[in-house]
């Protein structure tokens, strides 16, 4: 019988340390809700999870970018809607002035309103902005929308299709001071109505495209989050079982260590 080395106590102490360490890990996982809290828990899983997280955040931001694109389109489309209304009124004035029952004074009054509406189109062209960017003049030709999590995933919005510069220039050359000029103005306005309609149609198509883009991005983000969760999140029920197991083993180890420490006391019986 030896007393310098108590192997049963040493084994019990070693197992108690192992159980205590496993119990602490289980507590950390249960408190954080994560299976992987540091690289040592699962190095490969952590690398995959972080890559997925980067993609998820990129997809979510791309969705917000697309929403911003829709807001820009709605701003431009709202302005064009008002231009449409103005053109309709201008055409109405031109048709009225074309009627030769109007005297010169009547036509002059009609032309005054006509010219004011031309100036209003110019004002809309010059002041319609989104985040300080002018949308309806020739200041900006295209807007690149980042609609993906990775580089190069872009949608280009062509603002030249809604540029009002040419429309304003064409209308500024018209007047309805007499029958002949009013007839010419009707034809010119019809051309500009067509141009504005085409611009609004383009914006509507782009908005519909972005709405589908957002749905796809949100769906991809949701699926990727589910995949990332399977890698990184802890199974609470399973981990609770592990915590309970290690807790029981730890208590048992403590009890066995106490028993092992009592064994050398038997040596004292030999010395009596």
Curated annotation (Swiss-Prot):
Flagellin is the subunit protein which polymerizes to form the filaments of bacterial flagella. It is found in: Secreted; Bacterial flagellum. It comes from Halalkalibacterium halodurans (strain ATCC BAA-125 / DSM 18197 / FERM 7344 / JCM 9153 / C-125). The keyword Secreted applies. The gene is hag. Keywords: Bacterial flagellum, Secreted. GO terms for cellular component: bacterial-type flagellum; extracellular region. This is Flagellin. It holds the Pfam family Flagellin_C. It comes from the Bacteria. Belongs to the bacterial flagellin family. Its main location: secreted. Disulfide bonds: none annotated. The keyword Mitochondrion does not apply. GO terms for molecular function: structural molecule activity.
């Amino acid at each position: 019988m030896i007393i310098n080395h108590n192997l049963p106590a040493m084994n019990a102490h070693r197992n108690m340390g192992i159980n205590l360490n496993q119990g602490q890990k289980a507590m950390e996982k249960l408190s954080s809700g994560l299976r992987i809290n540091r690289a040592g828990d699962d190095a490969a899983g952590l690398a995959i999870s972080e890559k997925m997280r980067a993609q998820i955040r990129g997809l979510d931001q791309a969705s917000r970018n697309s929403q911003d694109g829709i807001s820009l389109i709605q701003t431009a489309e709202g302005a064009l809607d008002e231009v449409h209304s103005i053109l309709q009124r201008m055409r109405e004035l031109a048709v009225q002035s074309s009627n030769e029952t109007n005297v010169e004074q009547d036509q002059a009054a009609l032309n005054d309103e006509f010219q004011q509406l031309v100036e209003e189109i110019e004002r809309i062209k010059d002041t319609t902005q989104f985040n300080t960017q002018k949308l309806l003049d020739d200041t900006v030709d295209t807007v690149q929308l980042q609609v993906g999590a990775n580089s190069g995933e872009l949608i280009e919005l062509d603002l030249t299709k809604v540029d009002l510069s040419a429309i304003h220039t064409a209308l500024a050359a018209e007047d309805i001071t007499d029958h002949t000029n009013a007839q010419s103005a009707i034809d010119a306005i019809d051309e500009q109505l067509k141009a504005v309609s085409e611009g609004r149609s383009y914006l509507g198509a782009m908005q519909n495209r972005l709405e589908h883009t957002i749905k796809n991005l949100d769906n991809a983000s949701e699926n990727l989050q589910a995949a990332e969760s399977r890698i990184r999140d802890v199974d609470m029920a399973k981990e609770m079982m592990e915590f309970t197991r290690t807790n029981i083993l730890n208590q048992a180890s403590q009890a066995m260590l106490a028993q092992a420490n009592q064994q050398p006391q038997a040596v004292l019986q030999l010395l009596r």
